[in-house]
Amino acid sequence: MRESILTIPVTDIFEPKCGCPICRLRDTLEQRTVEYIMGAAMMEPDVRMETNKLGFCKTHFEQMRACKNRLSLALMLQSHLQDMQKHIFTRKKMFEGKTAKQKKVSAVNNECFVCSKVDWGMSRILVTLFEMYVQQRDFRDLFAQQEMLCLPHYDLLVSMCTEDMDKKYQKQFIDACGELTSKYLDTLEADVSHYCKMYDYRNTGANADWGNSKDSIERAIKFLTTR
């Protein structure tokens, strides 16, 4: 798979200042990878070997199924199923252990071609992010201007920065991440609480003021899970 597909300028991800920028990065990498394998790449032998070996998780199967080219998905499924027939569910070999097939199935169940490419792309782009944070004041300002960081990506950035960022800037970066997450958490909690209060009979009626609470359930789930 061409590395250029998984290369995105960091500033392009952070310029919109809407939602979690790391979710935006993940979504962009997912979209590019799915479009790539649902196109002509599905006929490339090296790509087919990888998709046969790794398969796909439910989330990315659904994204692929939503694409218009169902034949591409069917051909990948055909090849993947045939590969499992050949390499997993074959006649038991003489010295094969009792759980050998189960271990192979477990490997397939816990792997995903798209996830592996997204993780690969994100790990490299985030290292670039850390370098930019250290070297460019403008980017530090841009980072601080983001709307929020979701909880899982706060965890990811803070854990990665302790390994991949200049120690001199780690505290400043961790504090910036905490500010983006806690500030949005306060707003979100207030919106969810307001939503709950609107079911009190005293707050009903044609002129009931829901404020920003109507989509607070969906926003809370996305904040907690990235999805």
Task: Cite the ranges covered by each PLM segment.
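Intrinsically disordered, low-complexity regulatory regions of eukaryotic proteins
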Residues: 1-227
